[in-house]
Design a protein with these regions (language model features):
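Short small-residue beta-strand/loop micro-motif enriched in glycine and branched aliphatics
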Residues: 1-4, 109-110
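Residue-level detector of conserved, well-ordered beta-strand and adjacent loop positions
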Residues: 4-5, 39
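Substrate-positioning beta->alpha
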Residues: 5-27, 34
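Short aromatic/basic micro-patch
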Residues: 10-13, 43, 105-106, 118
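Residues in well-ordered alpha-helical elements
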Residues: 17-20, 47, 109, 122
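Mid/C-terminal beta-alpha module of Rossmann-like enzyme folds, strongest
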Residues: 25-89, 120-137
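Active-site loop of classical SDR/Rossmann-like NAD(P)-dependent oxidoreductases
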Residues: 46, 91-108
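Aromatic-glycine-rich donor-binding/catalytic loop that engages nucleotide-sugar donors
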Residues: 113-117
């Protein structure tokens, strides 16, 4: 895995089982219109997420390569240009670099509903990885 930038960018994440449980919980609300952004808290930065992923997948990399943002965005623009010239969709692009390095942190008012998620964010990430990378899939 190659980190772009410092890895301190914050990410808000929602685990699908927790979202499902919240929807079930919301069926008990009195009638009316309710609008929620659902995210599991606490938010994590990319360094924390990568640490959980490596630990769960038992990845032991000696070298943790970090590419400075300015270099990655230049490579992204080069990839954009090459993709445009050859009419090919290239896996790296300036937009993907920007999205990866951006903070995607959202507030949630779910806590005001007395809902308690049954899965912590770390547990949710581990369960997702174990499912996605299991041999029985």
């Amino acid at each position: 895995f190659t980190m772009i930038g410092s890895g301190k960018n914050i990410k808000s994440i929602a685990y699908v089982e927790n979202v499902s449980e919240f929807i079930d919980h919301s069926l008990n609300f009195s009638s009316g219109l309710y609008i929620f952004n659902y995210v599991d808290k606490p938010d994590m930065n990319m360094n924390e997420l990568v640490t959980i992923i490596k630990k769960t997948l038992k990845v032991k990399s000696i070298i943790n390569l970090k590419i400075p943002y300015f270099l990655a965005i230049i490579l992204g623009f080069v990839a954009d240009f090459v993709g445009y010239i050859f009419r090919k969709n290239i896996p790296i692009s300036s937009i993907r670099v920007k999205k990866f390095c951006a903070d995607t942190q959202f507030d949630t008012s779910v806590n005001s509903t007395e809902f308690v998620a049954s899965h912590s964010l770390e547990e949710a990430i581990k369960k997702t990885l174990e499912f996605e990378f299991s041999k029985q899939r």
